[in-house]
Curated annotation (Swiss-Prot):
One of its GO terms (cellular component) is T=1 icosahedral viral capsid. One of its GO terms (biological process) is clathrin-dependent endocytosis of virus by host cell. InterPro entries: Capsid/spike_ssDNA_virus (IPR016184), Capsid_VP4_densovirus (IPR003433), Phospholipase_A2-like (IPR013607). Keywords: Capsid protein, Clathrin-mediated endocytosis of virus by host, Host-virus interaction, T=1 icosahedral capsid protein, Viral attachment to host cell, Viral penetration into host cytoplasm, Viral penetration via permeabilization of host membrane, Virion, Virus endocytosis by host, Virus entry into host cell. The keyword Acetylation does not apply. Residues 315-325, 346-365 have a biased composition (Polar residues). It is found in: Virion. Capsid protein self-assembles to form an icosahedral capsid with a T=1 symmetry, about 22 nm in diameter, and consisting of 60 copies of size variants of the capsid proteins, which differ in the N-terminushe capsid encapsulates the genomic ssDNA. Capsid proteins are responsible for the attachment to host cell receptors. This attachment induces virion internalization predominantly through clathrin-dependent endocytosis. Residues 315-366, 373-392 are annotated as: Disordered. GO terms for molecular function: structural molecule activity. The N-terminus of VP1 is sequestered within the mature capsid. It contains a phospholipase A2-like region and putative nuclear localization signals. This is Capsid protein VP1. Residues 379-390 have a biased composition (Gly residues).
């Protein structure tokens, strides 16, 4: 509360309570005091106070605004003004008031000793005084000083307190001295007056909110400077016709008011709004050397004494003080003790020390006593039986040691260029077996091996990853660049070709989950038709030796190690990714059927892929697919260290069924004889050398789970395919005779860019001071089962089995 409000309140006589005007009544009692007290409406105080708070240059404008804004308040409180000016006190209706007895000098001295000039603290209701009248007078003294400090009054627990809370006496909102036409542009208003009228009014609201959260004078100054900068921006924008002029008037008034306020603050040293709620402690160096002087002058709050700048140390913020509040607030709230301060204010006086060095009367302990007692080491004075008088001190919680190992996220991105062929559909039959059981229907859909690590990182990047590393997300973007259709210019009349053939492009996601086929690598083609595959082998990822060998994805993309690759210098053995060159996708999707099973023919694969006219999608991203593995471990998981006796824990009751890693055995695909049986598999923590090989699948949720009795919902990573449909060679009508098969195809190929990116998470925690490797707790340990899942076979109901890989066909 400002000087003007304090003076007005003081002249109104001791005992007046200022509450919001919308609850003015003569029925509110002071609880235990029980005296009906006439009330002075806050509206009139607000009108006078906030007119002066704007600053001298704006005093005239503020006075006019105050009169206009609070005209009705001034009229309703005319008798209150008359009381203040004449000294003949009446209530709001003009009736004479019953005069109170003045507070005795004894009560004032008692209050000085108890509160030590600090009225931010709560009123100690449990003080045991000689008479009830002393407590009544002490409360009047306490509330009188709180009003002078601009703080809300304390209501004792009684009828008056309950009534005040039920009527929300201390929660009413005030308008403040706002500029006409605005809701927040001006001092003293509340923070919930509805939506701002325009942009400068919104800036003023943000400024008020910053005030309400300010804990230091620096934060108040920062809030002022921020508002002034925004106001000047509005003025400049209006001059440049970038903003409505409606903000300009308010911006000029607001900036002028803040500037005037800061000038007055610099001259007087008084900060508005008040940040006096900051609890201050006397610097320990003065406590030791000036102890007698401090004890003598602290009851008067060092009035009239020029103190050193470092006399106080401000350590407690406004939010930590139970009575702290900002000048701009929604409403005054009753003084309430925080849990950490209950020991300071609620201690029974009978338990206080009767030491002659304790200057407190009636057994009340003060902050000075605590400070002085703690500043006399070795004397034993002022201490309790526990070795130190901790009454009134906050609880000190000793920080616990903790190491946050954190998680490191690394992103690996590669850009590959691949060539695909417009392969023709052809049925490949098994040879050398009676009955020709296996049948493959070839397609042009080339597999993009995004389930394999080499697509994202080279050998060194993989080797340098620590144990426990796992892929948390991978993403692939497939961009179709263009296609090429070739033909022989010297062809005979039966194999003519033109330049305007139609070529279609196909894309598919998740064909592996259908269970209708598998990926294969082609090892032979028809001699006179290079677009027709005639033989196949298992898909190629790692290096394959022999006539149909493959260098492997690592050597193909990134090159081989010159120290151990005998073919390092051979022609064509260069790192395609490293030089931005094209290489080939090795595997293509094939549908599969066993002829002795009544499967019902070839299913409609076209329902599950998308087709495009290749001429319309050049340089277009046709696939952008992301996947988050359920269990993407790519390095051996962290282990736990067993300590205690016995190391072999024996049987442990877990109170429920163990969620063992079960496997389903499916036999007899025919509907009539199909059976699904369950097998429970024990958890194992050892891993074969190839389990976390660079060519292992990223998704391992069918084989791994977390914790000794944890459970995972297994899944497989969906496949990605892109293909260029075979382009037929144009011929004469000979093919229409006797329904001759179409087996003449033009050489065609397509070019695609694949941008592959994966995010790897790693963490290296340790809980033992001499552990030589990272470790974790048993609940985070990863276990495996002994089922060898084979992703080179077709899936069943969305998961892979452990059947053998189909050999060469």
């Amino acid at each position: 509360m400002s000087f003007y409000a304090r003076a007005l309140t003081h002249r109104a006589r001791p005992g007046y309570r200022i509450i919001p005007e919308n609850t003015v009544t003569e029925d509110i009692e002071l609880g235990a005091i029980g005296e009906e007290t006439p009330l002075l409406s806050e509206g009139i105080i607000t009108a006078a106070e906030e007119t002066a708070a704007v600053g001298l240059p704006e005093l005239g404008v503020g006075a006019v605004g105050a009169v206009g804004t609070h005209a009705d308040v001034l009229y309703r409180n005319r008798n209150a003004f008359k009381s203040v000016l004449t000294g003949n006190y009446t209530d709001l209706k003009g009736n004479p008031l019953k005069q109170r007895n003045a507070i005795s000098e004894k009560t004032k001295q008692l209050g000085k000793q108890i509160f030590q000039g600090d009225f931010n603290r709560a009123f100690p209701d449990n003080l045991k005084l000689e008479t009830e009248q002393e407590k009544t007078d002490l409360l009047r003294y306490y509330n009188h000083n709180r009003r002078l400090a601009g703080l809300s009054e304390a209501y004792p627990q009684g009828k008056g307190y309950a009534y005040a809370k039920s009527q929300k006496v201390l929660e009413a909102e005030k308008r403040g001295l706002t500029v006409p036409g605005y809701k927040y542009l001006g001092p003293g208003n509340s923070l919930n007056r509805g939506p701002p009228t325009n942009e400068i009014d919104a800036d003023a609201k943000e400024h008020d909110e910053a005030y309400s959260q300010s804990k230091t004078a620096q934060e108040v100054s920062k809030a002022d400077n921020t508002f002034v900068n925004k106001a000047l921006d509005h003025v400049v924008n209006a001059i440049n016709l970038k903003e409505s002029p409606s903000n300009t008037v308010g911006a000029i008034i607001g900036a002028t008011g803040i500037g005037t306020k800061q000038a007055i603050e610099k001259h007087t040293g008084v900060i508005y709004p008040s940040v006096s709620g900051m609890s201050r402690e006397i610097n320990p160096k003065y406590l030791n050397s000036w102890s007698d002087w401090i004890k003598e002058n602290k009851p008067n709050n060092f009035a009239g004494i020029q103190l050193p700048e470092d006399f106080y140390t401000e350590e407690q913020t406004l939010s930590d003080s139970p009575m702290s509040e900002s000048t701009k607030r929604k409403a005054d709230t009753p003084a309430e003790e925080t849990p950490s301060k209950k020991g300071a204010h609620n201690t029974d006086s009978s338990s206080q020390s009767a030491d002659p060095q304790n200057p407190s009367s009636s057994g009340a302990t003060t902050d000075l006593d605590v400070t002085m007692a703690m500043s006399l080491p070795g004397t034993g004075s002022g201490t309790s039986s526990g070795g130190g008088n901790t009454t009134g001190q906050e609880i000190y919680e000793i920080p616990r040691p903790f190491t946050n190992f954190g998680k490191k996220l690394s992103t690996y991105t590669k850009s590959h260029k691949f060539m695909i062929f417009g392969l023709a559909n052809n049925v490949i039959a098994e040879t050398g077996t009676t009955g020709n059981l296996h049948r493959l229907l070839t397609t042009c859909l080339a597999e993009i091996p995004w389930q394999k690590i080499p697509l994202y990182m080279n050998q060194s990047e993989f080797d340098l990853l620590p144990p426990g590393s796992r892929i948390v997300e991978c993403n692939v973007k497939v961009i179709f660049r263009s296609n090429r259709i070739a033909f022989e210019t010297s062809s005979t009349a039966t194999k003519q070709a033109t330049l305007n053939q139609i070529s279609n492009l196909q894309t598919a996601v998740g064909l592996n989950k259908l269970g209708w086929g598998i990926d294969r690598s082609f090892t032979a083609f028809q001699s006179d038709q290079p677009m027709i595959p005639t033989a196949s082998a298992p898909p190629k990822y790692a290096s394959v030796s022999g006539a149909n060998g493959y260098r492997g994805m690592i050597a193909d993309y990134y090159g081989a190690d010159s120290n151990n690759d005998i073919a390092f210098g051979n022609a064509g053995n260069y790192p395609h990714h490293q030089v931005g060159s094209f290489t080939f996708l090795q595997n293509y999707y094939c549908m599969y059927i066993q002829t002795e099973r009544g499967t019902g023919g070839w299913p409609c694969l076209a329902e599950h892929f998308q087709q495009y006219d290749s001429k319309t999608v050049n340089n277009q991203c046709l696939l952008d697919v992301s996947y988050k593995p359920q269990m993407g471990m790519i390095k051996p998981p962290l282990n736990y260290n067993i300590i205690g006796f016995p190391t072999n824990k024996g049987a442990i009751s877990i109170g429920e069924n163990l969620t063992a890693m079960r496997s389903a055995n499916v036999s007899g695909p025919e509907i009539a004889t199909q059976q699904v049986s369950e097998t429970s598999n024990n958890r194992i923590h050892n891993f074969p050398a190839t389990f976390f090989d660079i060519y292992a699948d990223i998704e391992k949720s069918q084989r791994l789970n977390k914790g000794p009795w944890g459970f995972e919902h297994p899944q497989i990573q969906p496949s990605i395919h892109i293909g260029m449909q075979a382009v037929p060679a144009l011929t004469t009508g000979a093919l229409l005779v006797n329904s001759s098969p179409l087996n003449s195809w033009t050489d065609s190929m397509g070019y695609v860019d694949v941008i592959a990116s994966c995010t790897v998470m790693e963490s290296q925690p340790t809980h033992f001071p001499y552990a030589t490797s990272a470790n974790t707790n048993p609940g985070n340990t990863v276990y495996r089962n002994n089922i060898n899942v084979n992703s080179l076979t077709s899936a069943f109901n969305g998961l892979y089995g452990n059947a053998a890989t189909l050999g060469s066909l």
